[in-house]
């Protein structure tokens, strides 16, 4: 009984702390109700999950919105892992990662294509400067995919 109570308290504390960090009512990155497929701190085969994963009901091409204003701090495209991924650094010090994307917004896609042609490679990773690609809260930054 005591062990069950401790486990319940730990789970409750975890949920409360996640709720304060990720109030999905205010920060929904999609235009559909949030259904999580992965949660922060969830045990994976060889690590703890470091984010939340949102289900898209198998739909590709949904608009993906920025959680808050900031700037694109990293873009990585690879055949494995996250596939197309976008990292946005926010003024409060947090970084949000948007992964498994089908494509980026036209503003970002234009810069990505230019870098790909310059490097003659589909797979790229680069770190834009702070003033290079700024985004606003709720700006469309990408479209959902299945990579």
Language model regions located:
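Surface-exposed, glycine-biased beta-strand/turn segments
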Residues: 17-85, 89-95, 102-107, 121-123, ...
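N-terminal low-hydrophobic presequence detector
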Residues: 1, 99-102
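Sec-dependent N-terminal signal peptides
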Residues: 3-13
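Charged interaction patches that mediate protein-protein contacts
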Residues: 10, 94-97
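A solvent-exposed, charged loop/short amphipathic helix patch at secondary-structure junctions
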Residues: 111-123
